[in-house]
């Protein structure tokens, strides 16, 4: 039994959900518009402002996709209503981040700077008080993938903790070399 799949989704007044043929769903809201094609075997019903997701049988595949479908729908509704933000922290003395048009320029201690093109649907904000990057968008998966792509450029090293990490991420530290006595 999927506990997540059986929960109902409450649709806010500011969000419009359209269920078209073969479970093609369009969700529009104040932040933007998202579209997704769900598995056609899953039943998705919109009753007034409540969405119910149900499966036709108890096969293993249907059990797996039931909760996933409900979670994706919930994320779509939350994304077009409020949006999602991933925050990255940059730890290191000479590490810098610049925003030039549609490009993100990262200076991460390499002999060259790294230039990343910002995709459509992603907004980037560089706060002034802390060294970091705020990645915003309406698609939770897309925002997370882009943030992960940036974080992989310079993973935090265990001795000084220098690198790019997600906000609140704990880095396991190691002791340095000890001298002989």
Swiss-Prot record:
Matches recorded under SUPFAM superfamilies: Ribosomal protein L6 (SSF56053)
InterPro entries: Ribosomal_uL6-like, Ribosomal_uL6-like_a/b-dom_sf, Ribosomal_uL6_a/b-dom, Ribosomal_uL6_bac-type, Ribosomal_uL6_CS
Entry protein name: Large ribosomal subunit protein uL6
Encoding gene, per UniProt annotation: rplF
GO biological process, any: cytoplasmic translation
GO cellular component assignments: cytosolic large ribosomal subunit
Function: This protein binds to the 23S rRNA, and is important in its secondary structure. It is located near the subunit interface in the base of the L7/L12 stalk, and near the tRNA binding site of the peptidyltransferase center.
Keyword Ribonucleoprotein: yes
Alphabetically ordered keywords of this record: Ribonucleoprotein, Ribosomal protein, RNA-binding, rRNA-binding
Assigned protein family: Belongs to the universal ribosomal protein uL6 family.
Binding partners and assembly: Part of the 50S ribosomal subunit.
Gene Ontology MF, one: structural constituent of ribosome
Organism of this sequence: Phytoplasma mali (strain AT)
UniProt keyword annotation of Secreted present: no
């Amino acid at each position: 039994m999927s506990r997540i799949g059986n929960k109902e989704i409450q649709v806010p007044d500011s969000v419009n959900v359209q269920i078209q043929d073969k479970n093609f769903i369009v969700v529009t809201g104040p932040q933007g518009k998202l579209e997704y094609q769900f598995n056609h075997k899953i039943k998705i019903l919109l009753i007034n402002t409540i969405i119910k997701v149900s499966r036709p049988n108890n096969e293993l595949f249907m059990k797996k996709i039931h909760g996933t479908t409900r979670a994706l729908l919930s994320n779509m509704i939350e994304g077009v209503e409020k949006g999602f933000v991933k925050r990255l922290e940059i730890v290191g003395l000479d590490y810098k981040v610049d925003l030039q048009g549609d490009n993100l320029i990262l200076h991460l201690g390499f002999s060259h700077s790294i230039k990343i093109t910002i995709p459509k649907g992603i907004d980037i904000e560089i706060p002034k008080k802390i060294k970091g990057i705020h990645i915003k968008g309406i698609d939770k998966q897309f925002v997370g993938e882009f943030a992960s792509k940036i974080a992989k450029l310079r993973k935090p090293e265990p001795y000084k903790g220098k690198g790019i990490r997600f906000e609140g991420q704990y880095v396991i530290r190691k002791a340095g070399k000890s001298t002989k006595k």
